[in-house]
């Protein structure tokens, strides 16, 4: 998924300023110039260091974190150990002059300050934008402090929550000189961005000039199903007495021993995959799937707790800063994203919106819902990778 970053550097300077990017264009592998052909490897290692653009260092960016109190009623309803997320935090990087502002929506379960929003922030800041980084509606901080129903996955609701956050950011930063508004998101954040842009067509608060969707899921159910299945991958060397984590840790240990030092970063991951200790396809698939399972567990746990559903945490169970949440998180780890949809999202959708079948829900939360808008709007630009693991049959044709 993350191997869009090299092309995003080009898009950052060009795409948002172009007049019309609605025409689809395939880029062959040779012209693309990306050296990793394995989609799992590209997802984990990201763009090789030598292909990354020169970007400003964090200390050279005028930036600051801010907080918003959007759900004051939850301040006393949430457990004490949720104190860090009773207010929604975001990051603003400002230019020293009037400039366009771009909102960046993080991917599945991601915090506003995670690695991809940080990368995109530097990219667009260097191009002259004010930049606002927002957490994903599926992150526990957003769910607790900004989401009305704390049950992410119904895209229209998620877009409404994001839109309210963006309006609150603009109100809080009323003295910031903004010439135009832009919007981008990656992975699930790109799907969110599409729905936010569509919402803005009727509410007209921002009149986004351009919207850039980076590697969006087309069919949300297909995407999460593909990722859920990765955790079931059969990996050589894993037995009842030797876990997947022990296999990966032993490989990393041998790698660092040969290197003579320990330094974990994106460049290291790329170099690691060029070494003899490199992860196999099965190990990489398991690693990606496991990461997604942790995100799904976070969503299931937080949604259940905020709404007092009692599926994971007993509704009246006393939780304070000293309470261990490990038993509940272990229970949440047994629930993949499809389980979360079945037990929490679909019941909420049916109760609140008189929803029907799973097929109806999938059509309402996926890009299919916006097909005419995406086709007709000249402001929407999409960048995707043909071998992205979140895509299913027919998805590229849709784009």
Which stretches of residues belong to each language-model region?
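Active-site nucleophile elbow and catalytic-triad environment of alpha/beta-hydrolase enzymes
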Residues: 351-372
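N-terminal cap/lid segment of alpha/beta-hydrolase-fold proteins
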Residues: 29-97
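Gly/Ala-rich beta-loop-alpha elbow adjacent to hydrolase catalytic centers
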Residues: 184-193
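Alpha/beta-hydrolase active-site loop
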Residues: 151-173
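Alpha/beta-hydrolase-fold enzymes
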Residues: 199-323
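Short beta-strand/loop motif that positions the catalytic acidic residue
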Residues: 376, 382-384
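Short, surface-exposed "cap/lid" segments of acyl-processing enzymes
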Residues: 93-140, 393
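Conserved alpha/beta-hydrolase "acid-adjacent" motif
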Residues: 362, 389-395
